[in-house]
């Protein structure tokens, strides 16, 4: 099988790519990443020359690039996104472009190319605060930041493409992930480093 992984130079995407290549020896993996500040070029360089991996540097907002990357792929795993809450509050424009326009481009190309499965990586931030009990898959979306709103819009675009174009898609809503190679600005490493340095811990909500 041939699959496309977007955002593969990012934290989760890079781990997923290495895992897939290791555990699916018959598969070919195409990765697409714009290599923004959040993309770690070293993760791409580690896979340079791998016989079953091909890297394309480009934006998910560019339909021509996406179409080239997606050609012949049966599975698309869409990690690419702007993901920092605080940055979205300062400047929401990149979040709207990547998380909404870029996701729409990905979905449109996937529907046209006839992929067998589109996996959209989202976030629990789209759900907002728990009013009562626990979040459910059918619960309302209550985004509380421009980042969360942009990801919620992406989720709704996925639902729309399922209904309108019968695109076989699933949404994965991650919560606070952490591990080696993560950017220090993210919540878990920031909390740990602040605690080690006797600085205030960030509290959201």
Task: State where each predicted segment sits.
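N-terminal Rossmann-like NAD(P)+-binding domain of SDR-like oxidoreductases, especially those catalyzing
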Residues: 1-177
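A short C-terminal helix-loop "cap" of Rossmann-like NAD(P)-dependent dehydrogenase/epimerase domains
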Residues: 49-50, 165-168, 192-203
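Glycine/proline-rich active-site loop of Rossmann-fold NAD(P)-dependent oxidoreductases
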Residues: 152, 177-190, 197-199, 203-205
């Amino acid at each position: 099988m041939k699959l496309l992984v977007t955002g593969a130079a990012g934290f989760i995407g890079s781990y997923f790519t290495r895992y897939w290549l290791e555990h699916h020896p018959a598969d070919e993996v195409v990765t697409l990443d714009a290599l923004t500040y959040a993309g770690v070029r070293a993760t791409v360089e580690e896979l340079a020359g791998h016989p079953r991996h091909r890297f394309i540097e480009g934006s998910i907002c560019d339909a021509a690039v996406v179409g080239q990357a997606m050609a012949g792929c049966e599975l698309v795993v869409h990690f690419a996104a702007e993901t920092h809450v605080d940055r979205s509050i300062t400047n929401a424009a990149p979040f709207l472009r990547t998380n909404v326009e870029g996701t729409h481009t990905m979905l449109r190309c996937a529907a046209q190319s006839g992929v067998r499965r589109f996996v959209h990586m989202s976030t629990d931030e789209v759900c907002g605060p728990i009013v009562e009990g626990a979040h459910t898959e059918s619960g309302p979306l209550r985004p509380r930041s421009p980042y969360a709103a942009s990801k919620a819009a992406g989720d709704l675009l996925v639902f729309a493409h399922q209904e309108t174009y019968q695109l076989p898609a699933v949404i994965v809503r991650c919560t606070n992930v952490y591990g080696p190679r993560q950017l220090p600005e993210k919540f878990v490493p920031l909390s740990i480093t602040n605690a080690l340095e006797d600085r205030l811990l960030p509290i959201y909500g």
